[in-house]
A protein has these predicted regions:
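Long, highly charged low-complexity segments
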Residues: 1-88
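Compositionally biased, low-complexity linear motifs
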Residues: 8-15, 133-141, 233-238
Length: 238
């Protein structure tokens, strides 16, 4: 079971049980109009699931959206055909919390969709706060904050040649757990950024740079990651 894959005790185990029984609405193509009012909320949490970690080549499998209470899932075909979703994505006034802005922007642009309005990225925040850690998967970030209930992708999909693709309800629930976790992490990470005096660096430098890097990658500009990391270290020291 999911609980066995996660383990944990106390409140973490309670959260794991809540996550195992997570409620998610699978929006069908003929139901999208009913959910347009949901997109009027701001902020919303967004998660895009891809077929691999290489967002330059990966297929988009599905989308999860959450307001913290309700979790929606759409397979990619349904999401791609939903005009109101495309408008919401590109609206800078509609706040979006996510995991990996750059990956989202590149993957969506490859599908002909622009996206804007990202106000928080839990992966980027984790890189700043836990710079010495190499593990920044969403499940790693949650585990470090004692947020239970999200299994590692490898535990869900399998590894290498044994990797399988999820579909239907199984995929919907996995993405609902991810989007719910992002929603939980956002205020925690924002507080950690403030406590570590990294909030100005995050909001005034790192977030804007992420948008620039996405555009550069889409344009095919080679990015010297090591040099950028070095610059980041120098900026943190000042």
């Amino acid at each position: 079971s999911l609980l066995e894959r996660i383990g944990g005790e106390g409140s973490s185990a309670d959260e794991a049980e809540e996550m195992e029984n997570i409620s998610v609405k699978r929006v069908q193509p003929d139901e999208t109009e009913e959910w347009e009012s949901f997109l009027q909320q701001s902020p919303l949490t967004l998660y895009l699931e891809m077929s691999s970690e290489n967002y330059h080549r990966a297929d988009l499998l599905g989308v999860a959206l959450s307001d913290g209470e309700q979790h929606l899932f759409l397979d990619w075909e349904t999401a791609a055909g939903w005009e109101a979703f495309a408008q919401w994505l590109q609206d800078p006034e509609r706040e979006k919390w996510c995991y990996d802005i750059k990956g989202n922007q590149v993957a969506l642009r490859r599908q002909g969709l622009s996206s804007d309005g990202y106000s928080f990225d839990v992966m980027l925040a984790s890189y700043l706060i836990n710079a010495s850690d190499s593990a920044h998967q969403l499940s790693d970030i949650a585990q470090r904050r004692q947020i239970g209930g999200l299994p590692e992708d490898e535990a869900v999909y399998g590894k290498g040649a044994k990797r399988r693709q999820l579909t239907g309800q199984e995929l919907a629930e996995h993405l609902a757990r991810k989007v719910h976790t992002i929603h939980q992490l956002k205020p925690i990470l924002e507080k950690e950024l403030q406590e570590n005096h990294l909030d100005a660096l995050f909001f005034e430098l790192e977030l804007p740079i992420t948008h620039v890097l996405a555009r550069m990658e889409l344009a095919g500009v080679q990015v010297d990651r090591e040099r950028l990391q070095q610059l980041g270290e120098e900026l943190r020291e000042h």
